[in-house]
C-alpha cells in the first residue's frame, strides 16, 4: 500500500507553481512502484517532488489522509475506499483517478483447477471486509458457490452464500499471510500484491483469477484524497504521472504485467 502526501509550505496554495514535497506512503509492491516514481524523469518533468514512506496498515493510511496529515494515497481499490468511507462516519475520501487492476487469484498446491477441489475442502479467505467480499465473488465467477442477489461487493460475507454444493469450509486469515499457508489448506484466495511479494504470478500460478468486467470494476486501484481536495490540480497531476510512458514501461517489466493499467474516468467505477 502506499500513500502520497503533498506537503505545502508557507501556507501557499497547491495550485501555485512552487515546488511541493509529496510524501508517499505505501506497502508491498505499491511501495516499490512509488519509490521508483519518486526518482523518475517523468516526476521531474511535472515538477512533482515525492518522498516515499512504507506504511503497512491501510486503515492508518486512510485515516491520515482523511485527517489531513497526508494529502493523497495510492494503494487501494475503489471498493476498499468505499468500505472505509462506509465504516468511518464523518470521513470522506474520493478518487482522483484510476491506476491499475490487480487480479485476485485462487491458488492451490494440491489442485490445478477449481473443479478438482474436493467436497469439504478448506479454502482460506481474507478476514477484512472488502477483500473477503471480493474473494467470494471470485468463487462465484468460478462456479464454486452462489451468492444472494443483493450481495454487497464491499461488505458481503460467507453468510451471504446461498448455495455451497461442495460444502467448502472457509478459514479466515490475515490476507497478507496467504502465500505462507498454501501447504496447510486446500486453496487460498490471495490479492495480487501479496501474491507477488510471495513469489507468485497471478497470471501463471493461480488456478483461477479475475478479469476486468462490469462485475469487477470496483476492484480497480485508485489514487485517493480527502473530499475537500478532489479538484486540486497538483494532486491530479499524480494521475498523469502514473500513466506516463516511462512509468508504465517500468511497472510492466518490474511486475511481469500483473498490474494491468486502467485509464478510465472515476465515473466508470461507480
List each language-model region with its residue ranges.
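A conserved helix-loop-strand patch within extracytoplasmic ligand-binding domains
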Residues: 96-145, 248-249
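A bilobed periplasmic-binding-protein/Venus flytrap-type ligand-binding module shared by bacterial periplasmic
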Residues: 103-114, 219-232
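Periplasmic-binding protein-like
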Residues: 132-140, 242-263
Amino acid at each position: 500500500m502506499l500513500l502520497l502526501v503533498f506537503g505545502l509550505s508557507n501556507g501557499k496554495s497547491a495550485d501555485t507553481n512552487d515546488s511541493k514535497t509529496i510524501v508517499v506512503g505505501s506497502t508491498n509492491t505499491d511501495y516499490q512502484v512509488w519509490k521508483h516514481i519518486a526518482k523518475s524523469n517523468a516526476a521531474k518533468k511535472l515538477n512533482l517532488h515525492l518522498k516515499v514512506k512504507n506504511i503497512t496498515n491501510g486503515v492508518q493510511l486512510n485515516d491520515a489522509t482523511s485527517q489531513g496529515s497526508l494529502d493523497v494515497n495510492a494503494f487501494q481499490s475503489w471498493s476498499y475506499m468505499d468500505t472505509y468511507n462506509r465504516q468511518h462516519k464523518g470521513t470522506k475520501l474520493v478518487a482522483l483517478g484510476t491506476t491499475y487492476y490487480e487480479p485476485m487469484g485462487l491458488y492451490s498446491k494440491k489442485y490445478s483447477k477449481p473443479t478438482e477441489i474436493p467436497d469439504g475442502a478448506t479454502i482460506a479467505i481474507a478476514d477484512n471486509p472488502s477483500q473477503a467480499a471480493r474473494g467470494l465473488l471470485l468463487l462465484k465467477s468460478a462456479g464454486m458457490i452462489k451468492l444472494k442477489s443483493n450481495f454487497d461487493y464491499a461488505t458481503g460475507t460467507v453468510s451471504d452464500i446461498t448455495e455451497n454444493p461442495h460444502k467448502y469450509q472457509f478459514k479466515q486469515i490475515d490476507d497478507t499471510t496467504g502465500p505462507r499457508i498454501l501447504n496447510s489448506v486446500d486453496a487460498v484466495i490471495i490479492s495480487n500484491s501479496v501474491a507477488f511479494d510471495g513469489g507468485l504470478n497471478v497470471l501463471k500460478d493461480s488456478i483461477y483469477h479475475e478479469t476486468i468486467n462490469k462485475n469487477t470494476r470496483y476492484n480497480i486501484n485508485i489514487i485517493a484524497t480527502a473530499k475537500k481536495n478532489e479538484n486540486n490540480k497538483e494532486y491530479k497531476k499524480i494521475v498523469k504521472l502514473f500513466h506516463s510512458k516511462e512509468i508504465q514501461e517500468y511497472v510492466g517489466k518490474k511486475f511481469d504485467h500483473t498490474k494491468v493499467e486502467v485509464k478510465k474516468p472515476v465515473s466508470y467505477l461507480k
